[in-house]
């Protein structure tokens, strides 16, 4: 039976977002939402017919809020809004981000506080389910008043305007609708504002980054465990007794993950008089990785709220009362997404240091740069440089966007969140850190193959090693390989959900205790 996710404005999960955005799962407006949507729309119709002054319905926008709009111009006002606010720059957002944007906007609208017609919401839903993906430039949002520019680009194809992708082809908005068998619409009063005024873009991009960060945290524990196998790591720093007396949830979870991954390993060791303790990047994984786990768990809790929230303005209350407020302001998510970037950056940073330990013959006691006949061969020399470059780039990207603001709209919108920048930066940091972690796994597997004695790996590390080696080759020497290809294979392996799923079938991994 084909899976369909019902949207009621209350119960959307981050896993649902992934299913619809990346796996093409269909969605449907839950029957429970229809009455509230219709009631909200009737209130807007009454406002127009009674010529009441309500922001964005019978007035202009932003600093033009005191300009009255006649009832006969309220429809043109909404189309003008979309045409002029679609002012984004840069490359288009990827398909999964666009689908997440469409989904989260629909889920917000079905709560029934935006005064939009049910048929208009259903039109956006039809585009989503039929795979018409608006061309949305990635830059141009201040994160307050919501994500106006990118969301206006989302709306254009609904009107037969702008550009959209359909079956991988970039078309005019009208042509995309025609090929998908979708009729264009005209907007009614308030509908343009209802579609574009909200934190939807920053929330969608940040939600994808948060989900991927959760997977990366588990992969980073796996990478660290493989490095411990190479270095014959001391296991006492991961004993439960050590962490229960400092019961930070992420720390406890990391220590347990490492224990589970290394269960049965014949490579790990205990402290001796000649070797009392390992360096921080190995010994302090629970504390370092755990701190990032706690930060990302907090971010996820904020995402869970935001994807089920109304971020429109004005709000049409159930009793007919209209409130002009600030739910569109992105600050509640801008700060968490800055935390997200910092947390992921630390994971990339510590992983790069472990890559250095693997390729450094003085630290690993293996051939320099993990290749036979170093000198004639350079092996992983520049691979470590590349990881260092990414880690250093992350340190620049991790500077918070939310500490900045710039006044706009004739100083009416005088403090903005820059939350969309925070979310986009977090995703860039995620991609960089994922590359570094993939390289650590690749280097650790190479190092294990170079060790003079092949001892049994742990319960989880063995599964990971075997799967990884099916796709990524051992590098014998430089002559017949292009290491770039192997690095890309390594990244592809860990980005494939089936890799981590297979490891988790063997051992339990979590980010919270």
From Swiss-Prot:
For this entry, list what GO says about its biological process: L-histidine catabolic process to glutamate and formamide; L-histidine catabolic process to glutamate and formate
Show the catalytic activity.
L-histidine = trans-urocanate + NH4(+)
The source's superkingdom equals: Bacteria
Q: Which residues carry this modification: 2,3-didehydroalanine (Ser)?
A: 145
Pathway given in the UniProt record = Amino-acid degradation; L-histidine degradation into L-glutamate; N-formimidoyl-L-glutamate from L-histidine: step 1/3
Principal localization reads cytoplasm
Q: What is its EC number?
A: 4.3.1.3
Report the GO terms under cellular component: cytoplasm
Q: Which InterPro entries match?
A: Aromatic_Lyase, Fumarase/histidase_N, HutH, L-Aspartase-like, Phe/His_NH3-lyase_AS
Localization in the cell: Cytoplasm
Q: Which residues form a coiled coil?
A: none
Kindly provide the PTM information from the record. Contains an active site 4-methylidene-imidazol-5-one (MIO), which is formed autocatalytically by cyclization and dehydration of residues Ala-Ser-Gly.
Instruction: Indicate the transmembrane segments per the record.
Output: none
| Molecular function GO terms recorded | histidine ammonia-lyase activity
Q: Where is this cross-link: 5-imidazolinone (Ala-Gly)?
A: 144-146
Give the PROSITE patterns listed for this entry: PAL_HISTIDASE
Keywords, A to Z, come to: Cytoplasm, Histidine metabolism, Lyase
Q: Keyword Lyase on this protein?
A: yes
- Check the record and name the NCBIfam families matching this protein: hutH, PRK09367.1
What family does this chain come from, according to its entry?
Answer: Belongs to the PAL/histidase family.
Please give the HAMAP family that the UniProt record associates with this protein: His_ammonia_lyase
What is the name listed in the Swiss-Prot or TrEMBL entry for this protein? Histidine ammonia-lyase
Q: Which organism is it from?
A: Streptococcus pyogenes serotype M1
